[in-house]
Amino acid sequence: MALEAGYDYLHVAVVQCTPTQAAAVLGVLLLLAIRLAAAARSSSATSPKWKQHRLPPTPPGKLPIIGHLHLIGSHPHVSFRDLHAKYGHNGLMLVQVGAVPTIVVSTPQAAEAVLRTHDHVLASRPRNPVADIIRYNSTDVAFAPYGVYWRTARKVVNTHLLSAKMVFSKRREREEEVRLVVARIRDAAEASPGTALDMTELLGGYASDFVCRAVLGESHRKQGRNKLFRELTETSAALLGGFNVEDYFPKLADVDLFLRIICAKAKSVSKRWDSLFNELLSEYALSGGKQGDHNSEDFVHLLLSLQKDYGLTTDNIKGILVNMFEAAIETSFLVLEYSMSELMNNRHVLAKLQKEVRTATPDGRMVMEEDLSRMPYLKATIKESMRIHPPAPFLLPHFSTHDCEINGYTIPAGTRVIVNAWALARDPTCWDKAEEFFPERFLEQGRDAEVDMYGKDIRFVPFGAGRRICAGATFAIATVEIMLANLIYHFDWEMPAEMERTGAKVDMSDQFGMTLRRTQKLYLVPRIPKCVSSS
């Protein structure tokens, strides 16, 4: 449970320190109890400020200090879906998460109101101390509060870094990185037929290598930078998506020693990010800031060349870059891994997809990006993977800047609002076979053929919708499509021998965080089919 995770964190803080530090921590814990009680009283949805409004229904069983935390299991997206089914109304439910009243949105109609109708009121973000540290005072596009700076940063990213033109211009780099992975798999399959490969490592490495190449240019493998950036990205994502006590008890931010203990790991990671970025910026300065063809510029050089035009500070640029690494690598990797996992558990889908890809691709070469337009089932498979396994179960929290009314209930100013994207995509009132992996739903003759995953259809919002929609959606999908198509084209895939013998399925268990990661690594056996020539 989330609460247990918090207790575990405090236990580690006390145990892994010197006696003097332990005494200080214990003193802080005593102060913590007092602060928590005060925070719960001042921020509770039962306070006078909240009582004057007609609020969404709330589950029974709220406890002092912790609120409804004890009702939230290890998979909060599932807990909130189930709690809403019992106690929510019109897509809304109010839960007290520690000292923080939080509105949970669980139906498309309510999500439409939050992400579109009242988007101007709900487009901001609640303060996140960990993001403030890792994302340079939250000056990235994802965590920055809604306002002048966010609009400027968003314009820079949309217009210059992740525009359709820029995504298209990176096709050569994508295809080259895919070619390297295919060659690596082919070499392994020829050297040791029947040996299972660590697909989690291969797919994560591909996503990291391509994103690093787009951001850093040809220097992305210098001194193992691609691996270091991947490590930092995974660590940062774990910190941002973990149980951070100060998120649920904001008054603890006033306790300096406690905040230092909680944020120590984030500060350590931030220093490593900063060291890398300073090294990159120094190299740029030594090179005189020259980068050749404008259309092939990496994101670091582009941002630095735009710095004066948009009034960006060096920390602003660093914050945007951290966001680029974390969002692009994590999303692309997870979609690829979940897609391959589902294909192995649904061999009829794999066979159908393989037939499409091999028919659409001329023999003797790799799948190229121009071939993808002839692969509707590939696109449907990726969409279905993202429907049933959205990379982020919750959209990043929204924050109301003014009172607004949704479905007859008031959302007071200063309220945290969470959209349960996982619940929307599995809502049985909106989807046939909601719990099944069924790509055919998105084909031309399917019921959901017109469903869009870029924010137009509110039932399916893996990238969000409205003002805060993810700017990197097309970048991520382009990264996924070309890799998945080539994996399916070049190889026949099997489970490890024992799993094939027993008919075992890939374990789809996942672990909650800012993203949903599978708990087990994916191991698969590649076979080189006779019908596909080496390319």
Curated annotation (Swiss-Prot):
Keywords: Heme, Iron, Membrane, Metal-binding, Monooxygenase, NAD, Oxidoreductase, Transmembrane, Transmembrane helix. Heme binds at C470. GO terms for cellular component: membrane. It is a multi-pass membrane protein. Pathway: Secondary metabolite biosynthesis; 2,4-dihydroxy-1,4-benzoxazin-3-one biosynthesis; 2,4-dihydroxy-1,4-benzoxazin-3-one from indoleglycerol phosphate: step 4/5. Its cofactor is heme. Signal peptide: none annotated. One of its GO terms (molecular function) is heme binding. It is found in: Membrane. PANTHER family: CYTOCHROME P450 FAMILY 71 PROTEIN, OS01G0543600 PROTEIN. This is 3-hydroxyindolin-2-one monooxygenase. The gene is CYP71C1.
